[in-house]
Amino acid sequence: MSRLPVLLLLQLLVRPGLQAPMTQTTPLKTSWVNCSNMIDEIITHLKQPPLPLLDFNNLNGEDQDILMENNLRRPNLEAFNRAVKSLQNASAIESILKNLLPCLPLATAAPTRHPIHIKDGDWNEFRRKLTFYLKTLENAQAQQTTLSLAIF
């Protein structure tokens, strides 16, 4: 008997689009693939022309600290959700940002500083800060996944 039908069936079972939808009771670990896809999609939109003349990664140390602080992940996402409303042609990013909240872990303590500030209508600043924020989320999730695998 050929193994091809079995392999095709297995492939269909593990494809993300054919799996059961995520629910409130689904652990966040299993939904990270979806979160990673959303982050990648936002970054793709952020790289659309016109590209800024400024360096994407040129953020001051204070902004970097605010964007990397674990307890500010949710307040920072709220700041990006407010800022995206002042931008033109950013509806695709806005809709994805709204769905990103379940990807963020709960804060372990109250924030000790204010969330990131983004100038209204400043596409380049929004793009630089959001790109840094999303890369920080990806790195944190990669570390969490590595720790989880090391435990097992």
UniProtKB/Swiss-Prot annotation:
Glycans are attached at N34, N89. Disulfide bonds join C35-C103. Keywords: Cytokine, Disulfide bond, Glycoprotein, Growth factor, Secreted, Signal. Cytokine secreted predominantly by activated T-lymphocytes as well as mast cells and osteoblastic cells that controls the production and differentiation of hematopoietic progenitor cells into lineage-restricted cells. Also stimulates mature basophils, eosinophils, and monocytes to become functionally activated. In addition, plays an important role in neural cell proliferation and survival. Participates as well in bone homeostasis and inhibits osteoclast differentiation by preventing NF-kappa-B nuclear translocation and activation. Pfam families: IL3. This is Interleukin-3. GO terms for molecular function: cytokine activity; growth factor activity; interleukin-3 receptor binding. Belongs to the IL-3 family. It is found in: Secreted. The gene is IL3. GO terms for biological process: cell surface receptor signaling pathway via STAT; cell-cell signaling; embryonic hemopoiesis; immune response; interleukin-3-mediated signaling pathway; nervous system development; positive regulation of cell population proliferation. InterPro entries: 4_helix_cytokine-like_core, IL-3. The keyword ATP-binding does not apply. It comes from the Eukaryota. Residues 1-19 form the signal peptide. Induction: Upon activation of the T-cell receptor/CD3 pathway and can be augmented by coactivation of the CD3 and CD28 pathways. PANTHER family: INTERLEUKIN-3 (PTHR48489:SF1). It comes from Homo sapiens (Human). Interacts with IL3RA. Activated T-cells, mast cells, natural killer cells. One of its GO terms (cellular component) is extracellular region.
